[in-house]
Amino acid sequence: MDINDISKAVEAVKQSSPQRKFEESVEIAINLKDIDMTNPKNRINEEILLPNGRGKDVKVVIFGSEELKAKAKGVADYIFGPEDISKFAEDKKAFKKIVNDAYFFIAEATLMANIGKSLGQVLGPRGKMPRPIPPGQDPVPLIKALKNTVKARSRNSLTLHVPVGTRSMDTQKISENIMAILNRITGKLERGHSNIKNVYVKTTMGKAVQVGTGDQN
């Protein structure tokens, strides 16, 4: 499949789905084949920076020192210090709300061990363990990059669902995002394109359109 096939599918999705009263996300479903997902080494677990962004904001949490917190102010959505780790360890319900609301977590490297010990039971199963950042490093570039990054995780399934943008985004930009994702995933598969059964594009509430055939599902 090439960029033209992808663009046709994206445009078909837009045409077939009525306008909603909210901004719909656009996502792809990548169906794999001939892969043993019971073997952990075959599972896909990728974070992919989209060339044209996600089209909407996602929330990023940072744990750090006063210096790191000051640098992250106005860019990160939740900013916490070392003292908040023990607070959340005692109030897991409050922490779970934040975890469910945020997409990525960052933590100063010196705090990682404490976070893993105190909050790992909440973060780990959700695939949201923090990315470590060295003390003193400016977190802003990483935060901005993560806000344009998506996760592609198969776990033990042969289907990956990955957000690629929003309906209001230009079709070409959405298509380029999809191409970037497919290139990354294909590069991780033992047999490349031969391990991909098919790819569908859909909006939040719309019908799925298969890339390359135009079939709806």
Swiss-Prot record:
Question: In its keyword annotation, does this UniProt entry include Cytoplasm?
Answer: no
What are the GO BP annotations of this UniProt entry?
Answer: regulation of translation; translation
Keyword Ribosomal protein included in the entry's annotation: yes
Query: Cross-referenced Pfam families, in alphabetical order?
Result: Ribosomal_L1
| Positions of transmembrane segments | none
Q: Tell me which positions the record assigns to the signal sequence.
A: none
Give the UniProt entry's GO cellular component terms.
large ribosomal subunit
Q: Which UniProt keywords apply?
A: Repressor, Ribonucleoprotein, Ribosomal protein, RNA-binding, rRNA-binding, Translation regulation, tRNA-binding
Q: Name one GO molecular function term.
A: rRNA binding
**Family indicated by similarity:** Belongs to the universal ribosomal protein uL1 family.
Function noted in UniProt: Binds directly to 23S rRNA. Probably involved in E site tRNA release.
User: Could you tell me which NCBIfam families the record lists for this protein?
Assistant: PRK04203.1
Concerning PANTHER family, the annotation shows: 54S RIBOSOMAL PROTEIN L1, MITOCHONDRIAL, LARGE RIBOSOMAL SUBUNIT PROTEIN UL1M
Q: How does it assemble?
A: Part of the 50S ribosomal subunit.
Question: What protein name is recorded for this chain?
Answer: Large ribosomal subunit protein uL1
**Where does this protein come from, organism-wise?**
Thermoplasma volcanium (strain ATCC 51530 / DSM 4299 / JCM 9571 / NBRC 15438 / GSS1)
The gene is: rpl1
